[in-house]
Amino acid sequence: MKKFNKVILAYSGGLDTSIIIPWLKENYGCEVIAVVGNVGQSDELVGLKEKAIKTGASKIYIEDLTKEFVEDYIFPTIQAGAKYEGKYLLGTSFARPIIAKRLVEIAKLEGADAICHGCTGKGNDQVRFELAIKTFNPEMQIIAPWRTWEIKSREEEIQYAIDNEVPINITYETNYSKDKNLWHLSHEGLDLEFPENEPKYDKILELCNTLEKAPNEAEYITLGFEKGIATSLNGEKLDGVTLLQELNKIGGKHGIGVIDMVENRLVGMKSRGVYETPGGSILYKAHKDLEELCLDKETSHYKEIVSLKFADLVYNGQWFTPLREALSAFISKTQETVTGEIKLKLYKGNIINAGMTSPYSLYSEEYATFGEDGIYDQKDAEGFINLFSLPSIVQAKMAQKLN
């Protein structure tokens, strides 16, 4: 096995990366520097420095990436309206590129000769991390233990941790695979691996109440947007991080943003996960409804196509690509008039539009009213229908002729 002098480890303090530190030292004889990308995982950061050093890391970087994460990754994805396979709000997907970018920067700073990640060989994250690493340093060596070591399951990981006195906070019975950041919390594994099983929401959920425990009374909120970016909550201007934190609290209280999904992974198989995205779900709904008011028909319809491709690119780890940047440029243009306020009613998992306004609204009461007006001459509709139906008429006459 090739030896390295210094390895940068993408560290979370979870099971995978906790046991990787002693494994790297044992198998590569290298110095291990742990790097934590703080993308809003909050309480998970507590005690990480002590844990990493105790486990064998020579030092640890805890990099605050939350502001950049929200402004440069989350907000552009909301503007795009991107959902993978119509449901997944890409919480893990767009968190990986920003972390990988920082790993490369610290590797250069430290003079490291390899970067290591703890992603499974069956998952999407290995692709997301390595695409970004190769983008910023094509020559960087990458170590992916899950593709080389003898450990084949999370149960074996737990046993390795026990054998090597690595402190962990999970047991065989609570061994859900989780990923948490400011945007979402995902849950995979155990009983969720069997689609016939109903998720044990009362045991799984951390950000959100179950619908049974959500308040019995609705709550109204008002969101303000400027060029497709949420900038205020209930009339108060907030920075992106604070706004999302507040929406997570409010949405979580009402059981909003919980999805149970079977998705098609990039690497070929299907997987099932439960995702909690309370604040994000509110922002997506608000933004989409405001677009309905502000975008013209052709732009709106074409943007739906762009949104699908944008979601695929993000899901597949292709954030730092010319196509994603080009699509973002198009999306940015569409957002120039997506400004206004929207009132939402939140109730037991539901997000209900309760009214919206915009200085760029394309909705005209004068044209849309069912009452009498002096603008729209309904007689004009007959000529329009005759022209619009011409292809159908020609097709029908041809069919009659053949018969």
Curated annotation (Swiss-Prot):
Its EC number is 6.3.4.5. ATP binds at A10, Y11, S12, G13, G14, L15, D16, T17, S18, G118. It is found in: Cytoplasm. GO terms for molecular function: argininosuccinate synthase activity; ATP binding. Pathway: Amino-acid biosynthesis; L-arginine biosynthesis; L-arginine from L-ornithine and carbamoyl phosphate: step 2/3. Coiled coil: none annotated. GO terms for cellular component: cytoplasm. Keywords: Amino-acid biosynthesis, Arginine biosynthesis, ATP-binding, Cytoplasm, Ligase, Nucleotide-binding. Belongs to the argininosuccinate synthase family. Type 1 subfamily. PANTHER family: ARGININOSUCCINATE SYNTHASE (PTHR11587:SF2). This is Argininosuccinate synthase. It comes from Clostridium perfringens (strain ATCC 13124 / DSM 756 / JCM 1290 / NCIMB 6125 / NCTC 8237 / Type A). The gene is argG.
